[in-house]
Amino acid sequence: MVNYSSISCIFFVALFSIFTIVSISSAASSHGEVEDEREFNYKKNDEKGPERWGELKPEWEMCGKGEMQSPIDLMNERVNIVSHLGRLNRDYNPSNATLKNRGHDIMLKFEDGAGTIKINGFEYELQQLHWHSPSEHTINGRRFALELHMVHEGRNRRMAVVTVLYKIGRADTFIRSLEKELEGIAEMEEAEKNVGMIDPTKIKIGSRKYYRYTGSLTTPPCTQNVTWSVVRKVRTVTRKQVKLLRVAVHDDANSNARPVQPTNKRIVHLYRPIV
């Protein structure tokens, strides 16, 4: 005789296990930046624009309610100059990487271990990098042509982002090394392309000074408690390079920069080493 109670018990245990796995997977994916950015946009006063991000999904509510949101305006008169934070010690190495069109930006995702950066004694592994144009962060109210985000994640799943700002001028050598691949994506229907081994140490920072504050991801779900390190020196990029990063996205938009968010009495440090 078939024991239906045993079968029912096994069925419900299996169903519960599947539900638990899906829930954990969903929670993990909601922590970091979304992989597909087509569910929101950067159009002002649009139903999917920055002012409405927090209303689009329950898990995106921090975009509208968070008190530690990014980007912010880095005003010299408000920063606390310190020397104890230490240099940005990047311990990167070449890694296999993929260029991916996420809908509103181009992301360079590292498939293998690309190395780490140490902040406040904790190591954060480099996961990916992407660009925003114009810049999201401003310095004394000034917005720049381009902003690079190098996104890291620690073992505690907290995020750390190292940011480089660019003004129009000479070509950036790292972007120049990717120009052929970016042009290829611009002509492809596919959303991603493997670009082989990429060395993140080739990204030039050129300054030991940087701003440090606690903020959030600048795209949904706008997760907070992100450690931001914004390099003080503004580097250069050509108009052609900025345009190439936008054309490759295929979204016909002129901008993918979130508006500046209220600082809300947060402390912003400017690390300046003692000579």
Swiss-Prot record:
Entries under InterPro entries matching the protein: Alpha_CA_prokaryot-like, CA_dom, CA_dom_sf, Carbonic_anhydrase_a-class, Carbonic_anhydrase_a-class_CS
Residues involved in substrate binding: T218, T219
> GO terms for CC?
chloroplast stroma
Q: Which UniProt keywords apply?
A: Chloroplast, Disulfide bond, Glycoprotein, Lyase, Metal-binding, Plastid, Signal, Zinc
- Identification of the protein by name: Alpha carbonic anhydrase 7
Q: What gene name is given for the protein in this entry?
A: ACA7
Q: Where is the Alpha-carbonic anhydrase domain?
A: 38-272
User: Lineage in the entry?
Assistant: Eukaryota, Viridiplantae, Streptophyta, Embryophyta, Tracheophyta
Task: Name the Pfam families for this protein.
Answer: Carb_anhydrase (PF00194)
Report the family membership. Belongs to the alpha-class carbonic anhydrase family.
Q: Which organism does this sequence originate in?
A: Arabidopsis thaliana (Mouse-ear cress)
